[in-house]
Amino acid sequence: MVQSDCLIASIQKYLDIFDHDATVDDIKYNTYEHFNIASSKINDSLFNAIKHSVYTCLHELYKIIKGFNKLNSYKFCGWVPTFFRKIRAKKYWMKYGIGVDSLSDMKTVIFPLHMEPEISLLQISPEFNNSYEIICWVSKNLPADTILVIKENPWSFGIRSKNYYDRLRKIGNVELARLDTTTEEWINRSIFTVAITGTSGYESIYFNKPVLSYGKYQIINYLPTVRYVANFFETRDAIKDLMCINNNVFLKSKYALHKSLMSCGFSLPRHLDYLDADYLVGDLGKILSGNLYDQYLVKFLGSR
């Protein structure tokens, strides 16, 4: 979630009024249900790869014939190889990945990778979105008893090359996370989380963990348990700082973030019931256009 005037003002307000005697026991983090549903539907079988390849080629051929194909877009059937590479990529991570309990004598830092290319990086964090450079910076500044654990995005298998993964494994204090482990498990096990714009930064606040943030416009950057950095030296200083944060500050961050999200947002209690309902698009369009028209009347005509 990016910054907004409402969220910034709200976080500053709740940080100021936080009482150390205030309870945060009722503040719970619930995993976004759509993520669980979508990730459970991922099918990386050979049959599915062939099926998607045929569909993709036919669909792109149809766009070319109809003249819908964009200039300077992806090359024809350019995504097809990724459908097959993801099968090998998952086997690679299961072979070389480690479990949460594999490093009992070491501390860990978790960095969940983003899906790339993706708008959450290219548009929301245009200043810095180089995951490999982040990994190099963090790994060079960690204490000798700490391992940087990299967790792949479920939708990115097949997009990053085997050579990319090989380069990660050549870094002495970097390990890959097994596919059967969750981000939540690694956050709870780690001393802090590395994030650019992903949800792992927010999850860490709810799980009372510090965050090393590389996303300039992250709203969590305003919290006392988060350090925003943009270069190697800031990374070094922030890591030292994050490892010395007082435990009471974590409650303050959780309280301020949760209260701000609740005050600036709104609930959609039945949104999962209509998640895949295309027939709602027209109705939502009418509602939104009606609201926009009403606001126009009030703002521009009502002031006359």
Residue ranges and their predicted role:
Residues 1:
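Conserved nucleotide-sugar donor-interacting segment of glycosyltransferase catalytic cores
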Residues 103-132, 137, 146, 152-155, ...:
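Active-site donor-nucleotide binding/catalytic segment of nucleotide-sugar enzymes
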Residues 59-101, 124-127:
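Segments forming glycine/polar-rich beta-alpha architectures that bind adenosine-containing cofactors
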Residues 179-226:
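A donor-sugar binding/catalytic signature common to diverse glycosyltransferases
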Residues 120-124, 159-163, 205-207, 223-225:
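A short acidic (Asp/Glu
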Residues 135-177:
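Catalytic donor nucleotide-activated moiety binding site of glycosyltransferases and closely related
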Residues 5-64, 93-96, 105, 226-304:
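C-terminal amphipathic helix plus adjacent low-complexity
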Residues 103, 169, 187-188:
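A short, aliphatic-rich alpha-helical micro-motif
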